Curated annotation (Swiss-Prot):
Heterotetramer, composed of two GyrA and two GyrB chains. In the heterotetramer, GyrA contains the active site tyrosine that forms a transient covalent intermediate with DNA, while GyrB binds cofactors and catalyzes ATP hydrolysis. It catalyses: ATP-dependent breakage, passage and rejoining of double-stranded DNA. Mg(2+) 2 binds at D500, D502. This is DNA gyrase subunit B. HAMAP family: GyrB (MF_01898). NCBIfam families: gyrB (TIGR01059), PRK05644.1 (NF004189), PRK14939.1 (NF011501). GO terms for biological process: DNA topological change; DNA-templated DNA replication. A type II topoisomerase that negatively supercoils closed circular double-stranded (ds) DNA in an ATP-dependent manner to modulate DNA topology and maintain chromosomes in an underwound state. Negative supercoiling favors strand separation, and DNA replication, transcription, recombination and repair, all of which involve strand separation. Also able to catalyze the interconversion of other topological isomers of dsDNA rings, including catenanes and knotted rings. Type II topoisomerases break and join 2 DNA strands simultaneously in an ATP-dependent manner. SMART domains: HATPase_c, TOP2c.
Amino acid sequence: MTREQQAYDESQIQVLEGLEAVRKRPGMYIGSTSSRGLHHLVWEIVDNSIDEAMAGFCDEIGVVIEEDNSITVTDNGRGIPVGIHEKMGRPAVEVIMTVLHAGGKFGGGGYKVSGGLHGVGASVVNALSTMLEVEVHREGKVHYQKFHRGVPAADLEVIGTTDRTGTKIHFKPDGDIFTETTVFEYDTLASRLRELAFLNKGLRIKITDMREEEKSDEFHYEGGIASFVEHLNRTRETLHETPIHIEGEKQGVYVEIAVQYNDGFTSNIYSFANNINTHEGGTHESGFKTGLTRVINDYARKHNLFKESDPNLTGEDVREGLTAIISVKIPDPQFEGQTKTKLGNSEARTITDSLFTEHFSRFLIEHPQVARKLVDKGLMASRAREAAKKARELTRRKSALEVSSLPGKLADCSSRDASISEIYIVEGDSAGGSAKQGRDRHFQAILPLRGKILNVEKARLDKILANNEIRAIITALGTGIGDDFDIEKARYHKIIIMTDADVDGAHIRTLILTFFYRYMRPLIEHGYVYIAQPPLYKVQQGKDIQYAYGDAELQEILSQLPDKAKPGIQRYKGLGEMNPSQLWETTMDPGQRTVLQVTLEDAMKADEIFEILMGDRVEPRRDFIQENARYVKNLDI
């Protein structure tokens, strides 16, 4: 972005409304009061520093998790204005900290481009913190003010002199609001800060954790999003050595795109608008996809790489094996939905499309060998898609009520209400038999799988759909897969993976999760996927039987037995060792069981781990195992 020395003082701070109701209804402002909402507080403060960086006035940001789980964020920007605000009659910094929708991002004067959740920013963090301190280095003086739950403890005061500029904010979230947790996750903060460093090339961001064992990371990438794509592809075999990097500006919209193809079968496209991850895509992403498909088809036609009778490659074909980052900086972003995850600006589509088309066309002409590889990969994907289409027809159910087309080994439930229905995907026929006998037939369906399903990370869709176990899963769930997926057609709102508590069981569970993540991801995003927790131990003392789900629970049960007791302890290796009534009581009875919901906090991290664990390359997997071996408690060997 170009640096323009604009006035950034108290006159640039606009006030829209007062700070009432934030403490009463925090979810309206930060999404939730769970761990996600807690971390959102940090992003609100960091986003203000990022706005300074995007305007060209800040190149260093620091985030510290203090010993008491409070947070300190520092930057070397211009410092929040401290002059008296004309309308409010209070220092501008106090207005920003205490008035909702007050800030330099509303009138277009202080910042041309900014992020932040609808600009609610610092005042919401202040309202939801037991304590917040702000220290501003500006015009040679250090200004300081402290707040409690959004209310100033004293007036802004000058506490010293300084030869630098910048802002330091220290806050402690309020445990009365964040009742679930007030403990910050280092990895959650670090992965987003790394993302922000990639998206703002040259910016240096440091995170430090002062709790138990001090650790820190520093993120600084001169390559920007091209470095980001290299980072995402580092465990994969790439088709061309360096990412294709494109940047340009039209009508005040700045577009930066980096793409690199690998030999995998899935695409990973991440889009951002003003540094905000647009999970649901939007106009910038669709503009990129349109341009990509058109350019590759035009190139292939012009260079006679297709037969004349061949149809054009589809978007799905040309995106196979693609890793791409699209980042736009736009003056007046229109985000659809309160969570800001879909960009709606129509100009972003045309500008992204035209800039990408122009640069990517030139790249293909200048690199004919790479162009040929991309077209060949698309053609192979097209053939696989046609084969998959035929295979898919075999798996498609004729209607949600027509049971005849369901897989033969599925023991369906009698309920047709998907919201109360659940399906257990069970490892092995013997456990499947026990589960069928032990279940509640009204709302519980059982689908036994024979052996291990295909590793979808290493296979194309046509091969995946030829696998009987996967076809049984697709047909039973009823949603379709990939681009045809429709969450409304889900026949069950709880899909519970139930495997043995050993290495093989864990492997089968990972294979099923890999399939869901790659081809039925909305099931995970909507919270439909669960993992059953069968007991590890059965403790029998006379006629009294208790079950333990882990070593700590086993020790607790044993400690409560009489001193001279000699209980029988059985460690379950497989589900088949339990009879139907035991399986129901321990693992399937909704009133007694424990099931773990599978959630998706960080799609990029999940993508990377699936690729490391399930992909072709051995080296990244070995490194991962060596790094994480110290966390293993029970080895099943």
